[in-house]
């Protein structure tokens, strides 16, 4: 939406800019939130400060390192993979736009203003999108949503009544994984010990009972 408006401002005359503002107002009147289908919202993501999100370069490196095969696959893997593809393509187009502006816009002040807007405002939105979908693929959507809610509660709680440090996403799935892994060995380990302590005669009686 903002990219559409920005393109019109750069390439068109003043009357078209006014028309683009009308179109932008119409688009803003639509209740479109790209996070809704995943159980989140723009407002929920906005609780996280801008410096929380890694740089786009780091996020892209993470996405390609973990999910490159799925991202490049022609098949549909998951809604999160599809959203990642769209965000990556959108950022590539924004970079092309910034490069074009840097080469063709004569006024240095206007050129710097447009490039700064793309990097700061649109860059933050892309960073939020990339972080959200990479985190959902890495930790699970429910864990990420729980984390966003917990951070929102932590931020809204007065400083005197909250822990000194904000919740950390990486600690949530680790606790869950440890618990899940810890249950199965605990169930299996007592049985061999009991078998060793039992006499051979009792083992045979157990095997007969099992055959029946």
UniProtKB/Swiss-Prot annotation:
Entry keywords, A to Z: Disulfide bond, Host nucleus, Host-virus interaction, Repeat, Secreted, Signal, Viral immunoevasion
Compositional bias ranges of the Basic residues kind: 178-205
Description of how the protein assembles with itself and partners: Homodimerizes.
Designated name of the protein: External core antigen
Compartments, as annotated in UniProt: Secreted; Host nucleus
Pfam families cross-referenced by the UniProt entry: Hep_core_N (PF08290), Hepatitis_core (PF00906)
InterPro entries for the chain: Hepatitis_B_virus_capsid_N (IPR013195), Hepatitis_core (IPR002006), Viral_capsid_core_dom_sf_HBV (IPR036459)
Entry-linked Gene3D superfamilies: Viral capsid, core domain supefamily, Hepatitis B virus
Propeptide residue range(s): 184-212
Annotated site location: Cleavage: 183-184
Residue ranges of the region described as Disordered: 172-212
GO molecular function, one term: RNA binding
Family under the similarity heading: Belongs to the orthohepadnavirus precore antigen family.
Function recorded in the entry: May regulate immune response to the intracellular capsid in acting as a T-cell tolerogen, by having an immunoregulatory effect which prevents destruction of infected cells by cytotoxic T-cells. This immune regulation may predispose to chronicity during perinatal infections and prevent severe liver injury during adult infections.
Region (HBEAG): 25-27
GO biological-process terms attached to the record: microtubule-dependent intracellular transport of viral material towards nucleus; symbiont entry into host cell; viral penetration into host nucleus
Segments annotated as Sequence repeats: 184-189, 191-197, 199-205
Keyword Signal among record annotations: yes
Sequence segments annotated as region (3 X 7 AA repeats of S-P-R-R-R-R-S): 184-205
Record-level GO cellular component terms: extracellular region; host cell; host cell cytoplasm; host cell nucleus; T=4 icosahedral viral capsid
Modifications the protein undergoes after translation, according to the UniProt entry: Phosphorylated. Cleaved by host furin.
Record's signal peptide: 1-19
């Amino acid at each position: 939406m903002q990219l559409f408006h920005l393109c019109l401002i750069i390439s068109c005359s003043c009357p078209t800019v006014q028309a683009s503002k009308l179109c932008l107002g119409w688009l803003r009147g639509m209740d479109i939130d790209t996070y809704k289908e995943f159980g989140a919202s723009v407002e929920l993501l906005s609780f996280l400060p801008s410096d929380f999100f890694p740089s786009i370069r780091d996020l892209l490196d993470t996405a390609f390192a973990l999910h490159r095969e799925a991202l490049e696959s022609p098949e549909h893997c998951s809604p999160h993979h599809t959203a990642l593809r769209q965000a990556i393509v959108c950022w590539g187009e924004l970079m092309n736009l910034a490069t074009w502006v840097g080469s063709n816009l004569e006024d240095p002040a206007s050129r710097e203003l447009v490039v700064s807007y793309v990097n700061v405002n649109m860059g933050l939105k892309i960073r939020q999108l990339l972080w959200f979908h990479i985190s959902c693929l890495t930790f699970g959507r429910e864990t990420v949503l729980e984390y966003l809610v917990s951070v929102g509660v932590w931020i809204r709680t007065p400083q005197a009544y909250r822990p000194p440090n904000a919740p950390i996403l990486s600690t949530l799935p680790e606790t869950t994984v440890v618990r899940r892994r810890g249950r199965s060995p605990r169930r299996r380990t007592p049985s061999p010990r009991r078998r060793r302590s039992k006499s051979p005669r009792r083992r045979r009686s157990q095997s007969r009972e099992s055959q029946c």
